Regions:
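Arg/Lys-rich, alpha-helical DNA-contact motif
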Residues: 1-23, 37, 42-48, 53-89
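Short coil turns linking two alpha-helices in DNA-binding domains
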Residues: 28-31
Length: 89
């Protein structure tokens, strides 16, 4: 569990590692990884190991929206379609 100080430091970064985004959002590591694999979360790959780095503001905003839609009972397929349609407009 991250400390309050660690979360404050994470909130200041422009890009977050997968584990940091999970901590900040209060979701499981596997959730972030799965949503990334589905193309729901934006990220850049960097370094020799091609680690994923998430733009903090955009990724947290998108994740909140995904979680809200999931609470409303939307399937991941419906959420993917929603974002595709929204991107097209």
């Amino acid at each position: 569990m991250p400390t309050k100080r660690n979360l404050e430091q994470i909130k200041q970064r422009e890009f977050l590692k997968l584990v940091e985004l999970a901590e900040l959002a209060g979701v499981r590591y596997s959730t972030i990884k799965y949503y990334s694999e589905l193309g729901l979360l934006p990220y850049e790959q960097r370094g020799d190991r091609l680690a994923k780095y998430y733009p903090r503001a955009e990724a947290t905003r998108r994740l909140k929206e995904i979680l809200k839609l999931r609470k409303q009972g939307k399937t991941l397929t419906a959420i993917i379609s929603y974002f595709i349609k929204r991107q097209a407009t």
